[in-house]
Amino acid sequence: MMVIFLGPPGAGKGTQGKKIAKKIDLPHIAIGDIFRTIIKTSTSEAELINNYVKQGELIPNEIVNQVIKNFLLSSEYKNGYILDGYPRNLEQAKFFESFIKEKIKIIYFDVSDELLIKRILGRYSCKNCGKIYNRYFVQPKTDNVCDVCGSSTFDYRKDDNEEVIKKRIEVYKTETYPLIDYYKNSGNFYIVNGSKNEQEIEIDIQKILKIN
């Protein structure tokens, strides 16, 4: 099974991607995580990518496409995956279709701008296991202690401030809305209400994918 999760930053793609991937025993490929890992390296490519991220700009298609192609053509992904955050525009979609021929289900997370901003501003994660929290909605049961692994070290994303977030959302709309129209006619396009809570969204996705 191959599934694409589409939606603006903060829509919940990463949270649901991890849950669903674990449930159906498939890899979860998060584009944002891939590039954040690259940024941590001491390379000219990392510096270039980091400049785009800091300014709230999308990373150029030619860079994104090559990174994704290298990942997806690896043998570990031959049985399927949950692809989170790619493609983001028509050019990327057509490049994707040039080397992936299998039938794919596309799920779009629909969320209001106001909720997106609050989700992103409040978001942080456990540095040890990656568990995602939010200072407004989902905090650890014990202060400063991860529910999953017990670590007390958390990672707060430095590029997340309101001005940059608003710009990222606007850039996303400009780039991605034409892609949504493109996929609507594919017969494999579905919309979930990303404003619901985690459990409700998970149930909706399970129904679409016909899993228990």
Swiss-Prot record:
Spans annotated as LID: 122-160
GO CC field: cytoplasm
Coiled coil ranges: none
EC number: 2.7.4.3
Keyword Transferase assigned: yes
Sites where the protein binds ATP: 10-15, 123, 132-133, 196
InterPro entries: Adenyl_kin_sub, Adenylat/UMP-CMP_kin, Adenylat_kinase_CS, Adenylate_kinase_lid-dom, P-loop_NTPase
PROSITE patterns per the UniProt record, alphabetical: ADENYLATE_KINASE
Binding site for AMP: 36, 57-59, 85-88, 92, 157, 168
SS bond list: none
Subcellular location: Cytoplasm
Region entry NMP, spans: 30-59
Cell inner membrane as UniProt keyword: no
Keywords carried by this UniProt record: ATP-binding, Cytoplasm, Kinase, Metal-binding, Nucleotide biosynthesis, Nucleotide-binding, Transferase, Zinc
Pathway: Purine metabolism; AMP biosynthesis via salvage pathway; AMP from ADP: step 1/1
UniProt-recorded Gene Ontology molecular function terms: adenylate kinase activity; ATP binding; zinc ion binding
Catalytic reaction annotation: AMP + ATP = 2 ADP
Top EC class of this enzyme: transferase
Ligand binding (Zn(2+)): 126, 129, 146, 149
Domain notes: Consists of three domains, a large central CORE domain and two small peripheral domains, NMPbind and LID, which undergo movements during catalysis. The LID domain closes over the site of phosphoryl transfer upon ATP binding. Assembling and dissambling the active center during each catalytic cycle provides an effective means to prevent ATP hydrolysis. Some bacteria have evolved a zinc-coordinating structure that stabilizes the LID domain.
Free-text function comment from the UniProt entry: Catalyzes the reversible transfer of the terminal phosphate group between ATP and AMP. Plays an important role in cellular energy homeostasis and in adenine nucleotide metabolism.
Family: Belongs to the adenylate kinase family.
Subunit composition and interactions: Monomer.
HAMAP family, per the entry: Adenylate_kinase_Adk
Protein name: Adenylate kinase
UniProt source species: Rickettsia conorii (strain ATCC VR-613 / Malish 7)
